[in-house]
Amino acid sequence: MWIEKYRPRTLDEVVDQRDSVDGIRALLKTPATIPHLLFSGPPGTGKSTMALCIARQLMGESFRRLVLELNASDERGIGVVRERIKGFSQVIQTAPSGVQFGLVILDECDEMTRDAQTALRRIMETSSRTCRFILICNYQSGIIEPIQSRCSIFRFRQLEKREAIAYLKSICKAENVSADQDVLERVFEFSGGDLRRAINALQVAATSSKAGKLELAQLSKIAPEDESDSVRTMLLAAVQGNFLKARDQMYELMGKRGISGREIIRTANREVVKLAELDSRKQVEAVRLLGEYDFRLSQGANEDIQLSAMLAQISLLGSK
């Protein structure tokens, strides 16, 4: 897969994120005293890649033996995490760089419950002599304060369009794929700033391209045109009291076009403040509603039911 083939392996290769890279370099000047780290920011901005680059620099050839990668949302509970870290900490050996600890990379920490995070804090305390932690999350606000206070925090921002497209161009060159600027811009826009998603889309499109030439027409299925107009039409119907029309538009977006519920809400969040039919107070209330239903979907609620309920509430809001 291209995302692994072209994943940066050193800090020099990391795309954008100069502030974070410079901060990490400063810490790595004294590797034996490096603190626990917390990386937060949107998906596909290089958090996991940065963690692995740090691990390679610290552990060298002992990388696989002295680094434990865990995904908080995949594990069966904090008890499993505790036992794996306990077993890992008991076999720590000195790395070539002189560090005398292992590195635990724990992804999606903001998906853990507060109770699980409290238990994780205790694990970090009891394992501090033999382990350093790199915690990765999308939202820093989802991490309890006692953990944040024990970490050096690095905030990853969305990648600059220019930097991301330059990286996509370098991949195309390496793979002997020709792609014009407008094609790469469409891929970037489709990705929403998620470089991992952009690279995956680029690979799928390149696989189906003819004679190594990537054109806009080939992107229609994997990187469709912006759905802002359709989402705006859906919102307008709801605001004007036509709930059934709004729901039909929602079903078309989800069923026929394959747009996820959370993608619809993200687009709606941009578009609802542009509706002249809602005064500023109602726009604020609509944004609050969108946030509430986005959270419900993030917790695994049914998309059809939640988006229908959201449109019903927006319809009621428009009639006030």
Across the structure, where does each feature detected by a protein language model lie?
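P-loop/Walker A NTP-binding region and its immediately flanking N-terminal helices
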Residues: 1-153, 162-163, 290, 294
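Helix-rich C-terminal "collar"/helical-bundle subdomain used as an assembly and partner-interaction module
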Residues: 233-320
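A short helix-loop-helix "switch/interaction" segment in the helical subdomain of ASCE P-loop NTPases
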Residues: 173, 182-196, 218-225, 234-240, ...
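Amphipathic alpha-helical repeat elements characteristic of tetratricopeptide repeat
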Residues: 5, 145, 162, 181, ...
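Short conserved motifs of the RecA-like P-loop NTPase core
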Residues: 101, 165-167, 178-190, 214-218, ...
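Conserved C-terminal helix/linker of AAA+ ATPases
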Residues: 206-233, 265, 282-288
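C-terminal helical "lid" of AAA+/P-loop NTPase domains
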Residues: 184-190, 196-210, 233-236, 247-252, ...
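Conserved AAA+ ATPase core "coupling" helix
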Residues: 144-174, 178-189, 198-201
